[in-house]
Curated annotation (Swiss-Prot):
Xref: PANTHER family: URONATE ISOMERASE (PTHR30068:SF4)
Catalytic activity: D-glucuronate = D-fructuronate; aldehydo-D-galacturonate = keto-D-tagaturonate
Annotated GO MF terms: glucuronate isomerase activity
Official protein name in the record: Uronate isomerase
Source domain of life: Bacteria
Keyword line: Isomerase, Plasmid
GO annotation, biological process: D-galacturonate catabolic process; D-glucuronate catabolic process
Record-linked InterPro entries: Metal_Hydrolase, Uronate_isomerase
Top EC class, one word: isomerase
Pfam families (UniProt xref): UxaC
Native organism: Rhizobium meliloti (strain 1021) (Ensifer meliloti)
Pathway: Carbohydrate metabolism; pentose and glucuronate interconversion
EC number annotated for this UniProt entry: 5.3.1.12
HAMAP family xref list: UxaC
Length: 469
């Protein structure tokens, strides 16, 4: 590595342990990337067009970036974040880039700083930190790179050594971009994941219309409970035809329910007609998690649950800029009681995989590791979102390994919209895990040959196996 990234990044300071971490890392640094969960756009791979200017690629869509800048008084309009009402925002990519570079010091100590340093150094060959003075030269260099064929999406997919990448797609998506990828003959593997929030959450914008659309595209009668469930089965099968191996569920809580079908049907009728109160809407979401788990047992799709985010905390930002604009905040999350109805129904099934994530780190050792350490259907997803920093990944290992071990976890997933940062995120995860394993060997808690095997599993094998890729 060159420039902004030290070869010993994130390795232990103690010399003997650091030397072992280096050796472990040398064994895994070149392994292919399995990216089983993320938010890149299938359109990029289908069209394989040049990315836009540096700001539109690296700044405007990245909520990790603009939320920090916003916290320091820089308006989202100044960063080019589009407003829903079409009101003016900055469109000059160079001006947006300059604001970012002038404030690069704000990211010191954050994972965003590591990801950007890595991307600038390893992808663009830059060895100078962003600053007011370096802003224009860096912009010109990155912009020139983006005009070249070797910086287009498919070329970068291959350069990053990606073996497979999953997008996250609405249950209502026609998967047209995925179809174009398959029709193109390109050998890259881009698969969808079934995200049904728009048709299982009564509080989702346009829910009644979404139910009608679900019926239209499946031919099922979504005016009835049985027809509604059949519509989900049809869509899941459609996603599987395009290579999907997983579903994803972004609920506010991990609450589940397992009502008798007659009660579930009556609840669905109230929800569909807009007559359900807040408790009934919550109960419906809980019931649907269990229904999705039962369907996963039937069709083999791995189920991911990403609960615990207070979405769109600022109503003013939501009204002006829409969802996913940096105002999603972690909340306390219960799993032991919340998941019990689902686990009572299907938790002992060895052929089911439910991957649990959390934004509440206090639940790692108290709830999640003990649950995954005994229920065959459960696995622990890696440190997520606010916690996918080097420190967050260390905390995850330290708080879960003693109870769940390594093999009830699923390796790493980058969960990103920022395509250029994917190799950075995987590299940092591999470094953190190699450092953790080296420490266990140094403390005589793990044999060195076991550490090498574990390093490969954590970097590659566990994700591939858990997500059935």
């Amino acid at each position: 590595m060159r420039g902004l990234i030290d070869p010993d990044l994130l390795f232990p300071a103690e010399e003997r342990t650091r030397a072992l971490a280096r050796r472990l890392y040398a064994e895994v640094s070149g392994l292919p990337i399995v990216s089983p969960h993320g938010h890149t756009e299938p359109r990029w791979y289908a069209l394989d067009e040049a990315f836009p200017d540096p700001a539109q690629l690296l700044i405007v869509p990245d909520h990790y970036v603009f939320r920090m800048l916003f916290s320091q008084g820089i308006r989202l309009e100044e960063l080019g974040v589009p407003a829903l009402d079409g009101s003016p925002v900055e469109t000059d990519g160079r001006a947006i880039w300059r604001r970012f570079c002038e404030n690069y010091h704000l990211f010191r100590g954050t994972p965003t700083r590591l990801w950007f340093d890595y991307t600038l150094s390893e992808l663009f060959g830059i060895d100078e930190l962003p600053s007011a003075a370096s802003s224009d030269p860096l912009y010109d260099h990155v912009a020139e790179c983006l005009t070249r064929p070797d910086y287009r999406p498919r070329a970068l997919y291959e350069r990053f050594n990606i073996e497979v990448i999953s997008t996250t797609d609405s249950a209502l998506d026609d998967l047209g971009w995925h179809a174009k990828i398959l029709e193109s003959g390109w050998k890259g593997r881009v698969v969808p994941a079934y995200r049904p929030d728009a048709v299982v959450d009564p509080d989702f914008q346009g829910f009644p219309t979404n139910l009608d659309k679900l019926g239209d595209i499946t031919g099922a009668d979504t005016g009835t409970w049985s027809g509604y469930l059949d519509a989900h089965r049809t869509r899941r099968a459609y996603f599987k035809d395009f290579g999907a191996t997983s579903t994803d569920h972004g609920h506010a809580t991990a609450d589940t329910a397992n009502l008798p079908q007659a009660e579930a049907a009556a609840l669905f009728d109230k929800v569909r007609l807009g007559k359900a109160n807040a408790d009934e809407r919550r109960l419906f979401r809980a019931q649907m998690l269990t229904e999705m788990a039962k369907m996963s047992l039937d069709d083999g799709l791995v189920m991911q649950i990403h609960p615990g985010s207070f979405r769109n905390h600022s109503p003013a930002i939501l009204a002006k800029f829409g969802r996913d604009k940096g105002f999603d905040i972690p909340t306390r999350t219960d799993y032991v009681t919340a998941l019990k109805p689902l686990l009572d129904a299907v938790g002992l099934e060895r052929d089911l995989t439910v991957i649990l994530f959390t934004l509440d780190e206090t639940s790692y050792a108290r709830e999640l590791a003990p649950l995954a350490g005994v229920y065959p259907a459960l696995k622990l997803g890696p440190a997520w979102w606010f916690h996918d920093s080097a420190e967050g990944m260390r905390r995850f290992r330290e708080m879960t390994t003693e109870t769940a071990g390594f093999y009830n976890t699923v390796g790493f997933n980058d969960d990103t919209r920022a395509f250029p940062s994917i190799p950075a995120r995987h590299d940092i995860a591999r470094r953190v895990d190699c450092a953790f394993l080296a420490r266990l060997v140094a403390e005589h808690r793990l044999r060195e040959d076991e550490a090498y095997e574990l390093a490969r599993d954590l970097a590659y094998g566990l994700a591939k196996e858990a997500y059935r890729l």
